[in-house]
Amino acid sequence: MRPLTMSGHFLLAPIPESSSDYLLPKDIKLAVLGASCVGKSAMIVRFLTKRFIGDYEPNTGKLYSRLVYVEGDQLSLQIQDTPGGIQAQDSLGQMVDSLSKCVQWAEGFLLVYSITDYESYQSIRPLYQHIRKVHPDGKAPVVIVGNKGDLLHARQVQTHEGLQLANELGSLFLEISTSENYEDVCDVFQHLCKEVSKLHSLSGERRRASIIPRPRSPNMQDLKRRFRQALSSKAKAASTLG
């Protein structure tokens, strides 16, 4: 399953040299979470370089940075890769030490499982619950990704199972093949960047609304002066009538 293709509006750009008149882009901070060997690092590298590399050393948690253009807006994208080792039976408490800092830092999340590994699918729910515990307002966007969609002969997780889980959690679901389709990978990151950017826009509008100056109230000296003027006017009117 895929959303509407958006890759044509998504460009990678080199980070420019610093300049005094260079306008800093918005920061977009994403985290890619999931069990071991589901293709998290491959997804990130595929997105950033368009190349697919199948074999990786065990990940120790790398941070990738790149300038991107989303529908004409320049964004400074940071993607945190995370170590695997998350199992379905892990409690939220067991995940705190290894993931809380990353989850607190990030603004949007990719939860990745492999369609060839049912246990990796079962780890998605506790990961999602941990995100919502750290971000209780429920605004941080989450996309659930079923990776390795080209390995149909080894499938253990059916498409409808991924869709059902995403519906229960209120998240977007996509089933992709990192190795075979760059556009699908790009669409995943594109969607998440747009959702985080929307949050930035909304929070910016709220901040601007909160600092709109209130009408200045007259101070006490002004009130006393007006009161004396009113009394004086009444006194003059009374003496005239008398």
UniProtKB/Swiss-Prot annotation:
UniProt lists the family membership as follows: Belongs to the small GTPase superfamily. Ras family.
* Cellular compartment(s): Nucleus, Nucleolus
Q: Which PANTHER family match?
A: RAS-LIKE FAMILY MEMBER 11
* SMART domains according to UniProt: RAB, RAS, RHO
Q: Which residues bind GTP?
A: 34-41, 81-85, 147-150
Which Pfam families does UniProt cross-reference here?
A: Ras
Q: Does the keyword Nucleus apply?
A: yes
Organism of this sequence: Rattus norvegicus
Q: What does this protein do?
A: Regulator of rDNA transcription. Acts in cooperation UBF/UBTF and positively regulates RNA polymerase I transcription.
User: What cellular-component terms does GO give this entry?
Assistant: nucleolus
EC id: 3.6.5.2
Q: What is this protein called?
A: Ras-like protein family member 11A
Which example biological process does GO assign this protein? positive regulation of transcription by RNA polymerase I
Q: Origin, by domain of life?
A: Eukaryota
Q: Is Transferase one of the keywords?
A: no
Cite the entry's keywords alphabetically: GTP-binding, Hydrolase, Nucleotide-binding, Nucleus, Transcription, Transcription regulation
Q: Where is this region: Small GTPase-like?
A: 17-241
Report quaternary structure and partners: Interacts with UBF/UBTF.
